């Protein structure tokens, strides 16, 4: 018999208590005392993000896109990514997407398409992300934040998509964004 989607989804976890372990302006870490899905007592560590994540796939009229290169401190490696960042939970994601595209790539766009939400590391975080497609681009100069040393690369969208599919791009926001953009555009 084929796997079937349950007709209802009940939370099998029960939270008995919670304590804050760490907090800074970007994250809050809590430890929950739980009754697990198997009925046993346990603990569960959760990282709550104070911002949402977002990514922008800018596409030119001739089918090119832009990747941003930067050093990612937590991973200890250089990463090519779509323009991405975050925004305060109380702000509009499109406003933050416009800001990130201008800061990182020096671009603005006359046409924006919401390509949907996604969850990052949903086994340990509540982080939610959103992807946008930016078209009808207007070119300017990047204005990165003080702690960002960025490189900008223009290449065909399908080449960037191939990089995401074959592992040359490993950033999750970029992989999701490039896959959704190519799908949306029917390429």
Residue spans for each PLM region:
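Nudix hydrolase/Nudix homology domain
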Residues: 2-13, 78, 89, 114, ...
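Conserved Nudix-box catalytic region and its N-terminal flanking loop in Nudix hydrolases
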Residues: 10-12, 47-50, 55-99
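Acidic, metal-coordinating catalytic segment for phosphate/diphosphate chemistry
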Residues: 16-55, 60-61
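Acidic pyrophosphate-coordinating catalytic loop
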Residues: 20-24, 73, 118-128
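Conserved hydrophobic "DFG−1" position in protein kinase catalytic cores
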Residues: 34, 58, 67, 133-134, ...
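Short helix-loop capping/hinge motifs at secondary-structure junctions, enriched
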Residues: 64-65, 138-140
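The catalytic Nudix box helix
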Residues: 67, 81-114, 132, 144-146, ...
């Amino acid at each position: 018999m084929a796997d079937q989607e349950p007709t209802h989804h009940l939370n099998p976890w029960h939270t008995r208590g919670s304590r804050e372990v760490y907090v800074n302006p970007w994250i809050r870490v809590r430890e929950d005392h739980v009754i697990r899905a198997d009925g046993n007592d346990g603990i569960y560590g959760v990282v709550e993000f104070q911002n949402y994540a977002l990514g922008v796939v800018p596409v030119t009229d001739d089918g090119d896109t832009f990747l941003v290169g930067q050093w990612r401190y937590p991973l200890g490696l250089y990463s090519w990514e779509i323009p991405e960042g975050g925004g305060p939970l109380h702000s509009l994601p499109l406003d933050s997407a416009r800001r990130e595209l201008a800061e990182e790539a020096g671009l603005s766009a006359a046409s924006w398409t919401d390509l949907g939400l996604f969850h990052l590391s949903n086994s340990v975080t509540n982080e939610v992300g959103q992807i946008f497609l930016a078209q009808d681009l207007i070119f300017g100069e990047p204005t990165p934040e003080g702690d960002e040393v960025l490189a900008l690369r223009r290449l065909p969208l399908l080449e960037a998509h191939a990089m995401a599919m074959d592992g040359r791009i490993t950033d999750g926001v970029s992989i999701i964004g490039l896959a959704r953009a190519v799908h949306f555009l029917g390429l």
